Regions:
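Acidic, low-complexity central loop/insert segments
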Residues: 90-94, 98-117, 122
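Glycine-rich, histidine-containing beta strand-loop boundary motifs that form or position
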Residues: 66, 81, 91, 101-103, ...
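Gly/Ser-rich oxyanion-binding loop with an adjacent helix/lid
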Residues: 2-75, 110-226
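Conserved small/polar residues in nucleotide/adenosyl-binding loops
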Residues: 227-234
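Structural signature of FAD isoalloxazine-binding scaffolds in flavoprotein oxidoreductases
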Residues: 75-93, 213
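Short linear Ser/Thr-Pro motifs
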Residues: 101, 106, 160-162, 231
Length: 234
């Protein structure tokens, strides 16, 4: 956790440039990303208040080969991309999630109400509710939090904006309440559950797996036994 003022200073002074290069690969994107992160932190301060926060990222994805074979028990080669969803987040002192996505109104939900609501099908709140329910059912600690998110993953462009969103919500809970101990495969599976059951979209698991594991991944869905292996960068 880092207080918002210090985070802005460190980003502006270039102390995280190596980290940005590792995440986004393209060094020409670093200045843009620094401004983007500073803006996100400033928006968090405006909407909520200056605070000690954590900043999370989940990338979009592109399939290399095997699109739609994930739900036909085939093999998939997919990769994360350097367009991502980032979220500035902190615990709050109640059982309420307050989530603001750039350009949208605040979503508020109580973590004690995690039942499927058919009226929420196809909405962002259903994804948050579904991820929280999945994490709780898997025995993980959940709690209230405030978050501001912004995304460069284009909606409707085949880059899995919804999967990136689900994964960033799961990663927020992993970071704030579970010491970042929820593994990426489980976050992906819970994200798929949220999209299938709460959002009401019968998607496969490729999108969430590529977004959560990161890098290039080879996924084998044969006999419904999930095996995933990161592929080398070079």
């Amino acid at each position: 956790m880092i207080d918002t003022k210090t985070a802005i200073e460190k980003i502006t002074n270039g102390e995280f440039d190596n980290l940005f290069t590792d995440i986004y690969i393209d060094s020409s994107m670093i200045d843009y990303q620094k401004k983007r992160y500073v803006h996100a932190i400033e928006q968090y301060e405006t909407i909520f208040c200056p605070d000690k926060v954590a900043i999370f990222s989940a990338p979009g994805r592109s399939e290399v080969c095997g699109n739609h074979t994930d739900h036909q028990h085939g093999m998939v080669l997919a990769t994360s991309i350097n367009l991502d969803t980032i979220a500035v987040s902190a615990k709050n002192n109640n059982d309420v999630v307050r989530f603001v996505s750039d350009g949208y109104d605040m979503i508020t939900l109580n973590i004690n109400d995690l039942e499927v609501n058919d009226d929420e099908a196809g909405t962002t709140v259903s994804l948050i509710r579904g991820v929280l329910r999945g994490l709780k059912d898997h025995g993980y600690k959940i709690g209230g939090f405030n978050a501001y998110a912004t995304s460069d993953v284009l909606v409707g462009a085949g880059l899995s904006s919804s999967a990136a969103f689900e994964v960033v919500v799961g990663t927020i809970i992993s970071g704030l309440y579970n010491d970042m101990k929820i593994n990426s495969v489980e976050i992906a599976q819970i994200s798929q559950y949220a999209e299938n059951v709460f959002f009401k979209k019968p998607c496969g698991l490729m999108d969430q797996m590529a977004c959560s594991v990161g890098g290039m991944v080879n996924i084998d869905f044969k006999d419904c036994l999930l095996y995933t292996s990161p592929s080398p960068r070079d």
